[in-house]
Each structure stands twice: as C-alpha cells, then as structure tokens.
Swiss-Prot record:
The keyword Transmembrane helix applies. Its main location: membrane. Alpha-2 adrenergic receptors mediate the catecholamine-induced inhibition of adenylate cyclase through the action of G proteins. The order of potency for this receptor is dexmedetomidine > norepinephrine = epinephrine > oxymetazoline. The chain crosses the membrane at residues 34-58, 71-96, 107-129, 151-173, 185-208, 340-363, 377-397. It comes from Danio rerio. The record marks 191, 195 as: Implicated in catechol agonist binding and receptor activation. It is found in: Cell membrane. This is Alpha-2Db adrenergic receptor. Residues 276-286 have a biased composition (Basic residues). The gene is adra2db.
Length: 415
C-alpha cells in the first residue's frame, strides 16, 4: 500500500518532505482552544435564545403582528440556522486545525454558510425597499402590504440567496482534510460583489433617499403645525365657572396640547393604535360635552358670541385630532425605519472587514499579505452579527422589550 494513502487516511497526521507521517499540531494552545470554545458557545446560545425570542414575540404580541415584521422572523430564522448548522462546524475546524467531516459535508457546509450570510443581507435589502415604499407611497403601498405579499417577498429573498450560493460551491471539489472557499480570483470578487457590496450599496442609497423624504416631510409637518397653532388665536372661548361667564384665551390649553404631544412622541414604533383611537374618541366626546356645557343659557349677544366661539374652536380641534392620527403613523414609520437602519449599520460593520480583506486578497495576492489570524478574526466578527439583532431590538424597541419580559415571566411562572 502506498504510504501517501495511509497518511491521507490519518487525520491526526501530516506528511513531511521525506514522505513519513508526522503528528498534526493544533493551531492553538490548550488554554486558547478552551477560551475559543467557551466564547463561541456563548455566542451560539445567545444567538439561538435571542432569535427564538424574536420569533415568539412577533407571533404572540399584538403590537408586533404587523405584516412587515415577518421580515424580522425570517431574518431571525437565518441567524438561528447559522448558529446551529454553520458555527459549530466552523468552531471544530478552528480548534482542530483540519476538516474532519469529509468533502461532501464540506460542500454543503460552505454552501449553507454563504447562503445564510447572503440571505441576511438580501433580507435587509428587501426591508429597506419595504421602508422606502411605505414612506414614499404610504397609502397605496400600505393597502398592498398584506402578509401574503410579504411572504412572497421573503420566498423570493431565499430563492435569490440560494441561486447565488449553491451552484458555485457544489460544483467545486474539496480536499478531505481542508474545507476552504474557492480561491480563484473570479469567484472571490463575484461572490463579494453579489453577496455583500451590491446589496449594501442598494441599502445605503435607499436609506439616503428615505432620509431625504423624511426630512422634507418633517419640514412640511412643521409648517402645517405652526399654521394650525396660530388659527385658534383668532377667536376666544367662553367658559362658565361657578355660574359666571369668563373669556379665556386658547393659550390656556397649550400646556395640555404639549402634554399630548409628549405622549405622542413617546409612542413606540409598532404600538397598537386601537387604544389610541379609543383614547382620542373619548377625548373628542369629552370636549364636545365641555363645549356644550361651557356656554351659558341663551342670553342675547353673549349666547350668540359664545356659540360662535365654540364653533370656531371645534374646527381646529377636529383638524388637530386628524393631524395627531397621521403624526402617530408617521412616528411609527420613523422609529421603525431608525431601528432597521441600526440593524443594517451593525450588519455592515460586522461583515465589511471580512469581505474587504477577502476581496483584497483576490486583487493583490503577492503584494498584500493578510495574516491568517486577522482574517479569522474578521470571519468570526461576522458570525457575531447573528447574535446582535435581538439585542438591538431590546435596546431600541419598547414593544420587543415588553414582549420579551412577558415571555420570560410566563416561562418563569410555569417553572
């Protein structure tokens, strides 16, 4: 039997220049290997638990049942698959220094790795387009934004990611003891462009456009708001206190309007609008009753002036109520867009070092020497992104915080 065949079948040995087998040395010391295993295990657990909480929260919380949140469910599913089907094998390959599971699983492992990374950024690209259409075509697009349409968009995202990921990797032959990405220049550059740089550029351009539209809309709302606040000053309102009629300026209500404005500004992005509609209807009814009771009984000019003032006062109030509802919807869209912008920015920050060094290696192989340790560090920073999204939702979204607390408290009471 040929000696090279024997050494090829022994995974813990390597062949030296004389053709004799030598023990394969691990790439890290024992302490470093233990530390790597502990850190990566924590990343896996945080990724699985956090993204499972996201999925459960979207399906169980009324405030999070908006159709567009299905994108977040699919994105969380991709991160869970990364933590279960990719990271454990990457950890074994990193600690042992060689690939133990054969060439067949290597091909699927690499395909799944590229698939989930590509699907994450394509998801974010689809989310940015969804945000753009909801901002620029608010009425028409929101009527079309049904769960069925969102599910179709998610299916298209996964199909595009699979078409990009699987064919090149499954057609490539792999060594039994090495599981590496295709090292040809054309594949490296094309995969980096299609899987990261092109979708990332689309996201940046779309969000720049969203920012411009939001800025223009904010200035328009500011002008309309100032005009609305000046209108009530043209009339005065009559109130009856302790049997006496008084004339009171609408400026006395400014503090109440400021309080309502503060409440409105504090509403979170996906908060259910049912309670707000009830609150606004109760407020409108109470104001009508107050307007009816505020004027004294008919008494010549005073009663005519008082009724006329009440009519003039109710018109701006109705206008203000409709503006409050539209502003509430705009606030939700604005805060939802901000949270997703943070998610996209963190994704780009986590994966840009890897894709930059990977493409740089393809362009200048000889003149640009990139240490393996640095390349591996960037690779693992990209994996860490799978555990970050639930943390972002928790920090920036009150509804997710409430849903997570409810899920955890429910679980603790059962145990």
């Amino acid at each position: 039997m040929d000696l090279s065949t024997i050494t090829f079948l022994l995974p813990n040995s390597s062949e030296d220049t004389n053709g004799t087998s030598a023990p394969r040395l691990p790439p890290h010391s024992q302490c470093a290997s233990v530390l790597i295993v502990l850190v990566v295990t924590v990343i896996i657990l945080v990724t699985i638990v956090g993204n499972v909480l996201v999925v459960v929260a979207v399906f169980t919380s009324r405030a999070l049942r908006a159709p567009q949140n299905l994108f977040l469910v699919s994105l969380a599913a991709a991160d869970i698959l990364v933590a279960t089907l990719v990271i454990p094998f990457s950890l074994a390959n990193e600690v042992m220094g060689y690939w133990y599971l054969g060439s067949t699983w290597c091909a699927f492992y690499l395909a799944l790795d590229v698939l989930f990374c590509t699907s994450s950024i394509v998801h974010l690209c689809a989310i940015s387009l969804d945000r753009y259409w909801s901002v620029t075509k608010a009425v028409s697009y929101n009527l079309k934004r049904t769960p069925r349409r969102i599910k179709i968009m998610i299916t298209v995202v996964w199909v595009i990611s699979a078409v990009i990921s699987f064919p090149p990797l499954l057609m490539t032959k792999h060594d039994e003891l090495e599981c590496l990405l295709n090292n040809e220049t054309w594949y490296i550059l094309s995969s980096c462009i299609v899987s990261f740089f092109a979708p990332g550029l689309i996201m940046i351009l779309v969000y720049c456009r969203i920012y411009r539209v939001a800025k223009q809309r904010a200035s328009t709302v500011f002008v309309a708001k100032n005009g609305m606040e000046r209108q009530p000053s043209q009339s005065e309102t009559c109130f009856v206190r302790k049997g006496k009629s008084e004339v009171e300026s609408p400026s006395s209500h400014s503090s109440g309007s400021r309080e309502r404005k503060g409440e409105l500004d504090d509403i979170d992005l996906e908060e259910s609008s049912v309670s707000n509609r009830h609150r606004n209807s109760r407020f409108a009814k109470s104001r009508k009753v107050e307007g009816a009771q505020s004027c004294p009984k008919p008494n010549g000019r005073l009663s005519w002036a008082c009724s006329r003032a009440s009519e003039l006062e109710q018109e701006p109030r109705a206008r203000q109520l409709s503006l409050s509802k539209s502003k509430l919807a705009q606030m939700r869209e604005k805060r939802f867009t901000f949270v997703l912008a943070v998610v996209m920015g963190v994704f780009v920050l986590c994966w840009f070092p890897f894709f930059f060094t990977y493409s740089l290696h393809a362009i200048c192989r000889k003149s640009c020497t990139i240490p393996d340790s640095l390349f591996n560090l960037f690779f693992w920073i990209g994996y860490c992104n799978s555990s970050v999204n639930p943390i972002i939702y928790t920090i920036f979204n009150r509804d997710f915080r409430k849903a997570f607390k409810k899920i955890m408290c429910r679980h603790s009471t059962r145990t």
